[in-house]
Amino acid sequence: VDAFADDLLLLVQGNRRNELEQSASEALSVVYRYGTNIGVEVSDSKTVCMMLKGSLNMLNRVVHVSTNGMDDKRIRCVDRVRYLGVNVGIGMDFSVHIDGMKRRLTTAIMRLRGVLRKSWGLKRGVVSMVVKGLFLPAVMYGASVWYEQLHKRKLRGSRRLSEELVSCQRVVLYACTRVCRTVSTEAMQILFGSLPWDIECFRRANCTKSKGPAMNESDLVTDEDLYELSLHECRELVDQRALAAWQDRWEATSNGRVTYEWIRDVGFSGRSMKYFGAEPEGLLRLTGHGSMNSFLFSRNLSNSPACACGTEREDWIHVLCECDMYAAFRDLDSIGVRRTEVGWDVSGVLLDRASMSVCVPLSSCAFRMRELIVQRMRENEES
């Protein structure tokens, strides 16, 4: 028996269906009699049965509960139940919890779209506070209970629950970072400074488990790592391991490689949004996704990948570092861009506040000038 406030959970076991039904009936009859004695009515609509393990099919069956001469109660068997805010399916399946979470997040984001626009709306600090103070706690509620199932799949061949959880994060990040829809989730996480939600789930669960329960193989730390450490030191170690796991994932993925050129260390994630804010041209050069001809041509949205200057390929690095049309705005040494044997290195730009203070206005002028050039070329073609 597990009770919290007015919610009650009864666990019964048996090897056969009739054993389960008899045990459940006996336990529930005690609950109904106790409620009658103290004047509390048990809600028939909220009282359900569900199989937590085994292969017996109890779905759509009814458990009859005797209540001492009163009308017998009929308890229906269901395939999912919500207990203390966490949705659980048959066989301790938490995929129903993540599916429901994604629907609720999508609904909440739709209601916030009025203040989360691409060119205006809430400031970056307010948006970050909404995500960290509203969305993240709601998503991570009960994480220490269901995080161990993130490696499982709902169906054979389907995505893992960890991937489903990250897809929930994408819904929030796309609304908050104001980037193109084609930008990868990995790049959005770096730009916004948001730990991948599956890793965040493990981090929070491990911080909770550091108080006593033993760790397992899937955790970020082991019992030996936490031996003789204080609670504060345990949580610091968990945070370090979470960042290390994020760093390994960021280096291994093939997505968001333009963003990787700017921000290679996840410890600096979120810094770009602090400097660039919601400027479309700033996010364009950090992601490579936008109005560049090479990007548009790769998606059959432009007739040619060439630049107006005659170069065969117009991308973010060409506009920022090479194109002669923007030479008047260019000062690569002062913004920390270096020429290497393999190309241009922009990884040091965001590391220094002085270089950023020069980079932002110079590159913004170059990209705005490009938009004017493109607009005039279109007007000439139409005329």
Swiss-Prot record:
InterPro entries: RT_dom. It is an enzyme of class 2 (transferase). Residues 1-88 form the Reverse transcriptase domain. GO terms for molecular function: endonuclease activity; RNA-directed DNA polymerase activity. Signal peptide: none annotated. It catalyses: DNA(n) + a 2'-deoxyribonucleoside 5'-triphosphate = DNA(n+1) + diphosphate. Its EC number is 2.7.7.49. Keywords: Endonuclease, Hydrolase, Nuclease, Nucleotidyltransferase, RNA-directed DNA polymerase, Transferase, Transposable element. Residues 229-383 are annotated as: Nucleic acid-binding endonuclease. This is Retrovirus-related Pol polyprotein from type-1 retrotransposable element R1 3. It comes from Nasonia vitripennis (Parasitic wasp).
